[in-house]
Swiss-Prot record:
It is an enzyme of class 6 (ligase). This is Pantothenate synthetase. Its main location: cytoplasm. The active site is at residue 37. GO terms for molecular function: ATP binding; pantoate-beta-alanine ligase activity. The lineage of its organism: Bacteria, Pseudomonadati, Nitrospirota, Thermodesulfovibrionia, Thermodesulfovibrionales. It comes from Thermodesulfovibrio yellowstonii (strain ATCC 51303 / DSM 11347 / YP87).
Amino acid sequence: MEVIRIPRIMREISKELRFKGKSIGFIPTMGALHEGHLSLIRRAKEENDIVIVSIFVNPTQFAQGEDYEKYPRDVELDKEKLEALAIDYLFLPDVNSLYPEGYSTYVVVEGLSDKLCGIFRPGHFRGVATIVCKLFNIVKPLRAYFGQKDYQQSLIIRRMVEDLNFDVEIIVCPTVREQDGLAMSSRNLYLNEKERQSATVIYKALKEGERLLNEGEKPLDVKLKMHEIFKNEPLIREIQYAGVYDPLTLEEVKERQNKYLLAVALKIGDTRLIDNLIVE
C-alpha cells in the first residue's frame, strides 16, 4: 500500500493507471474505519484492478458547532486495517492541499440537499458534493463505493454525477450492522454504554415500520408508530425526522405506493445517529 498526500501526485498516478487500461475502484472516507467501510473495500477489490481509499475529515461538511474537531481520528489504526486488506493506494491529503487560501468554488445539488438531513445540517451536502467532486477529479475512478446508511448522500452524489457528466459508476452497498441491528458508524464511538444500548431502538423502529407497511398500513400511521416507539426511549434527546419518504425525491409519502424509504435521524445524548430501510 502506497500512501499519497499530494493531490497532484495522486492525479498523475491515477491518470497513468487509466492510460494503462486499469480500472480504479474508489472509497472516499473520513477515517475511523469500521466494518462498513471494509465491506465497501472488499467489494471494490472484487470489481476493479486497483483500489484507492481516501481519508480526509472534510471541514466544509461540518456546520458551526458540529463535531469537526472531535470527529474520531486514528490514522495509524486505519492504515493497519487498509494494509490488512492489501489496497493499492491510500490518499491522505491535508486541509490546505484541498482548500488552499482563496478557495471559493462549491457544488450545490439543489432540491435533494434541502430535505431530511439538509434541514438540520445546513451546508452539509454542499460540503459533501464539493469534496466528492474534487476527489473524483483527482482519483479518476471508474467506480466509487458508498454505503446505504448515508442514503441521502448517495442519492445526491448520483444526481451530481449525472448532472455534471462524470464518468463514474456509483455503487451503493448494503448497510453493515452490529449484531443487535445498530448501523455501523464512526459516530457510534461517542456513545456510552447506556446510550449504545438505547440506540438499538432505531433499527427496531425501522423494522416495525417495514412490517406495518408490508401489512398494508398507511404511511402516516407508520410514521406515528415510529415516533411513539422513540418517545418511549428516555435517552433520545431529539427526533429530527422519522417517517416514510419517497426513495427518489425524499418527499414525505402520505399515500401507499410501490417503494418506500423509511428514514430516521435523532440524537441520543449529544450524538446524532441516522439510519434507513428501503421497503418494496
